[in-house]
Amino acid sequence: MVAYAIKTPPQHGTWPEILDLWRAADDIDVFESAWTMDHFYPLVPPLDGTELESWTMLAALAQATRRLRLGCMVNGMHLRHPAVTANMAATLDHIAGGRFQLGLGAGWFQPEADAYGIPLGTLTERFDRFDEGVEVIVSLLTRTRTTFAGRYYRITDARCEPKPVQDRIPIVIGGRGPRRTLRTVARWADHWDMTRPEDTGEWTRLDAVLREHCAAIGRDPAEIRRSVHLWWATDDDPAALADTAAGLAAAGVDLVVFSMRAPYDARRLEPLAAALAA
């Protein structure tokens, strides 16, 4: 059965309105999870606007909610050393009481990286670094000790303690690249997220590619949850959004994420929830 989630990118938003909306969503059973995003600069105009930092905010939102699973779609691998990310994830899972989900991506936003002097690299470098980083994170979160020697990351007899509350924090990998991203999804992910497909057919085609990658390594593709992002504009008709979500569910999508834009108004949640439950 399809599930539903909300996403509140912190660009141009204020802490009080995001907090209010998440608390309201926590009381609406239709929404199983809530998400933010990991950037320091807004992606939509005005580009010189504000952007709250995602991990700091998630720790506070974990304390402010009791039921929603929560995470960030997705965290850029280039922004933090994967050993740091692993420790942050384990700690956040304790704060959330086992509700955290770890979203990971290769990174892409060049203006932000240039402004902060954070190396982003070529596409090949990004995905090579991403593959290494995911392996480091998964190992640190699940094994007693980790030694890894790659091109981008080297760790020696490293520990990450305490381990998460969950036996395994779900690893969410976002993207649509058929050759590299979906191959990494097949190898490491518990959950694949795709943002705004052009239509259901595009998602179906990429899902077939993911299944091929799974077959190549002997993994059951049913082990991987699938989600899709939809924009949720202020003037969107909830019934139309529900119809779109139903079409995605029929195609095999497990979770539909409704991504909002600031200003955030908690009063928008109930009409959408009613349409989804109808």
Predicted regions and their residues:
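Active-site-adjacent structural elements that line small-molecule/cofactor binding pockets in enzymes
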Residues: 1-278
